[in-house]
Protein backbone atom coordinates (compact mmCIF):
# COMPACT_ATOMS: atom_id res chain seq x y z
CA UNK A 1 0.00 0.00 0.00
CA UNK A 2 1.51 3.34 -1.04
CA UNK A 3 1.86 6.18 1.43
CA UNK A 4 -1.48 7.94 1.81
CA UNK A 5 -0.99 11.71 2.05
CA UNK A 6 -4.59 12.93 2.24
CA UNK A 7 -6.31 13.88 5.51
CA UNK A 8 -7.62 10.91 7.48
CA UNK A 9 -10.63 10.70 9.80
CA UNK A 10 -9.89 11.18 13.49
CA UNK A 11 -12.21 8.79 15.33
CA UNK A 12 -13.60 9.66 18.73
CA UNK A 13 -15.20 7.44 21.36
CA UNK A 14 -18.55 7.49 19.51
CA UNK A 15 -17.28 6.99 15.95
CA UNK A 16 -14.45 4.49 16.55
CA UNK A 17 -16.78 1.45 16.18
CA UNK A 18 -17.97 2.84 12.82
CA UNK A 19 -14.39 3.07 11.54
CA UNK A 20 -13.54 -0.38 12.94
CA UNK A 21 -16.46 -1.85 10.99
CA UNK A 22 -15.41 0.01 7.83
CA UNK A 23 -11.98 -1.60 8.19
CA UNK A 24 -13.82 -4.96 8.13
CA UNK A 25 -15.72 -3.75 5.01
CA UNK A 26 -19.03 -3.38 6.82
CA UNK A 27 -21.07 -0.18 6.84
CA UNK A 28 -23.00 0.30 10.07
CA UNK A 29 -24.70 2.90 12.22
CA UNK A 30 -26.12 3.23 15.69
CA UNK A 31 -29.81 2.43 16.09
CA UNK A 32 -31.56 3.70 19.20
CA UNK A 33 -32.48 0.99 21.69
CA UNK A 34 -35.64 2.85 22.72
CA UNK A 35 -37.22 4.59 19.70
CA UNK A 36 -35.50 2.50 17.00
CA UNK A 37 -34.34 5.44 14.89
CA UNK A 38 -30.87 5.65 13.44
CA UNK A 39 -28.25 7.97 14.89
CA UNK A 40 -26.09 9.59 12.25
CA UNK A 41 -23.39 10.66 12.71
CA UNK A 42 -22.50 8.40 15.66
CA UNK A 43 -23.12 10.14 18.98
CA UNK A 44 -23.59 9.45 22.67
CA UNK A 45 -27.39 9.82 22.82
CA UNK A 46 -30.36 9.66 20.47
CA UNK A 47 -31.22 13.07 18.96
CA UNK A 48 -34.87 11.96 18.71
CA UNK A 49 -35.68 10.62 22.21
CA UNK A 50 -32.43 11.37 24.10
CA UNK A 51 -31.90 7.73 25.05
CA UNK A 52 -28.37 6.50 25.73
CA UNK A 53 -29.25 2.95 24.59
CA UNK A 54 -28.17 1.81 21.13
CA UNK A 55 -26.89 -1.07 19.05
CA UNK A 56 -24.72 -1.06 15.95
CA UNK A 57 -26.73 -2.12 12.89
CA UNK A 58 -25.39 -3.20 9.51
CA UNK A 59 -26.56 -0.85 6.76
CA UNK A 60 -27.53 -1.32 3.14
CA UNK A 61 -24.74 -1.23 0.58
CA UNK A 62 -26.91 0.75 -1.84
CA UNK A 63 -28.26 4.25 -1.90
CA UNK A 64 -29.13 7.29 -3.98
CA UNK A 65 -27.27 10.50 -4.71
CA UNK A 66 -29.26 13.17 -2.84
CA UNK A 67 -26.98 16.07 -3.76
CA UNK A 68 -23.42 16.57 -4.95
CA UNK A 69 -20.69 19.02 -5.88
CA UNK A 70 -17.80 18.66 -8.27
CA UNK A 71 -14.54 19.92 -6.80
CA UNK A 72 -12.39 21.65 -9.42
CA UNK A 73 -10.19 23.80 -7.18
CA UNK A 74 -7.30 22.33 -5.20
CA UNK A 75 -7.43 23.66 -1.64
CA UNK A 76 -5.32 20.87 -0.13
CA UNK A 77 -2.21 19.92 -2.15
CA UNK A 78 -2.71 16.18 -1.55
CA UNK A 79 -5.86 16.30 -3.72
CA UNK A 80 -4.14 17.88 -6.72
CA UNK A 81 -4.12 14.66 -8.72
CA UNK A 82 -7.82 14.01 -8.05
CA UNK A 83 -9.52 17.13 -9.41
CA UNK A 84 -12.14 17.19 -10.61
CA UNK A 85 -13.82 14.83 -8.12
CA UNK A 86 -17.31 14.37 -6.72
CA UNK A 87 -18.37 14.87 -3.09
CA UNK A 88 -21.94 13.68 -2.60
CA UNK A 89 -24.68 13.27 -0.03
CA UNK A 90 -25.77 9.63 -0.35
CA UNK A 91 -29.12 8.63 1.13
CA UNK A 92 -28.79 4.98 2.13
CA UNK A 93 -31.51 2.49 1.22
CA UNK A 94 -33.50 0.83 4.02
CA UNK A 95 -32.89 3.66 6.51
CA UNK A 96 -36.22 5.50 6.02
CA UNK A 97 -34.16 8.46 4.71
CA UNK A 98 -32.61 8.82 8.19
CA UNK A 99 -29.02 8.37 7.00
CA UNK A 100 -27.43 10.60 4.40
CA UNK A 101 -23.66 10.15 4.29
CA UNK A 102 -21.10 12.48 2.77
CA UNK A 103 -18.73 10.52 0.56
CA UNK A 104 -17.20 10.36 -2.90
CA UNK A 105 -18.76 8.95 -6.05
CA UNK A 106 -15.97 7.11 -7.85
CA UNK A 107 -15.47 4.86 -10.86
CA UNK A 108 -17.41 7.12 -13.22
CA UNK A 109 -16.78 10.43 -14.98
CA UNK A 110 -17.91 13.39 -12.87
CA UNK A 111 -20.10 14.58 -15.77
CA UNK A 112 -22.28 11.47 -15.39
CA UNK A 113 -23.16 11.92 -11.70
CA UNK A 114 -26.80 12.95 -11.24
CA UNK A 115 -29.19 13.62 -8.37
CA UNK A 116 -31.27 10.46 -7.93
CA UNK A 117 -28.53 8.21 -9.34
CA UNK A 118 -28.47 4.76 -7.68
CA UNK A 119 -25.08 3.90 -6.17
CA UNK A 120 -23.36 0.94 -4.51
CA UNK A 121 -20.90 0.97 -1.63
CA UNK A 122 -17.22 0.27 -2.24
CA UNK A 123 -14.50 0.34 0.39
CA UNK A 124 -11.11 1.93 -0.16
CA UNK A 125 -8.36 0.62 2.12
CA UNK A 126 -6.21 3.77 2.30
CA UNK A 127 -3.86 2.65 5.11
CA UNK A 128 -3.45 -0.50 7.15
CA UNK A 129 -5.68 1.11 9.80
CA UNK A 130 -8.17 3.21 7.80
CA UNK A 131 -10.78 2.16 5.26
CA UNK A 132 -13.05 4.76 3.67
CA UNK A 133 -16.60 4.08 2.45
CA UNK A 134 -17.17 5.41 -1.07
CA UNK A 135 -19.81 4.84 -3.73
CA UNK A 136 -19.93 3.92 -7.42
CA UNK A 137 -22.82 3.91 -9.89
CA UNK A 138 -24.94 0.75 -10.02
Region roles according to the model:
Residues 26-29, 43:
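Residues immediately within or flanking Cys/His clusters that coordinate Zn2+
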Residues 1-27:
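Flexible extramembrane loops and terminal tails that flank transmembrane helices
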Residues 40, 54-55:
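Short functional micro-motifs and their immediate structural scaffolds
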Amino acid sequence: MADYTKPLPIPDIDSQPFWDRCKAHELSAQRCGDCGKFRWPPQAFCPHCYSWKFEWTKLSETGTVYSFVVVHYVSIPAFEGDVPYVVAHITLDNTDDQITMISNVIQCPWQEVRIGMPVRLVFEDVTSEVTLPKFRPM
